[in-house]
Amino acid sequence: MESIPISVEGFRRLERELERLKKERPGVILAIKEAREEGDLRENAGYEAARERQGMLEARINYIESRMSRFNVIDLATLGGEQVIFGATVEIEDVDTGDVKKYTLLGPDEAEPSKGSISLLSPVGLALLGKFVGDEIVVDAPRGKINYEIVSIAFHGPIAAADD
């Protein structure tokens, strides 16, 4: 089994989510029991909604639990260097348009593109890994191939925790 990189903060966030989901379980089971007591289950929207919620809850619990044992927890405060690795914040410039983007490379379970972090397994993340300032990368995008130049690589320690 291959290990999955995750920051200490990302791991803690998933631990909190797992704990919260497990605390929700009894309430969902009770909702199913109460809906079942209402009679005919074929036309019982409350029962169907509770069963659907239970299915989603159990699926997420199982997913997190199965990943936990595979995580390689990395303290971002210990990282540094001149090469793009997990935890690096990289500034890239589109060679054709001059547009500049900044991303922090994180594991697939904690990446949030809307907050500036991407998975190191994403097309951009994979293209950046192992590169240095001044290197150019090519990313296949829906609008075609995009050439980027790496402008800067920085390591900032722990990332700000996202709202749960």
Curated annotation (Swiss-Prot):
Lineage: superkingdom: Bacteria
Keyword terms, alphabetized: Coiled coil, DNA-binding, Transcription, Transcription regulation
Keyword Cell wall biogenesis/degradation among record annotations: no
Keyword Transcription: yes
Annotated coiled-coil segments of the chain: 12-38
Pfam short name (any one): GreA_GreB_N
GO biological process: DNA-templated transcription elongation; regulation of DNA-templated transcription elongation
GO molecular function annotation: DNA binding; RNA polymerase binding
Family named by the database record: Belongs to the GreA/GreB family.
Function (record text): Necessary for efficient RNA polymerase transcription elongation past template-encoded arresting sites. The arresting sites in DNA have the property of trapping a certain fraction of elongating RNA polymerases that pass through, resulting in locked ternary complexes. Cleavage of the nascent transcript by cleavage factors such as GreA or GreB allows the resumption of elongation from the new 3'terminus. GreA releases sequences of 2 to 3 nucleotides.
Name under which the protein is recorded: Transcription elongation factor GreA
Underlying gene: greA
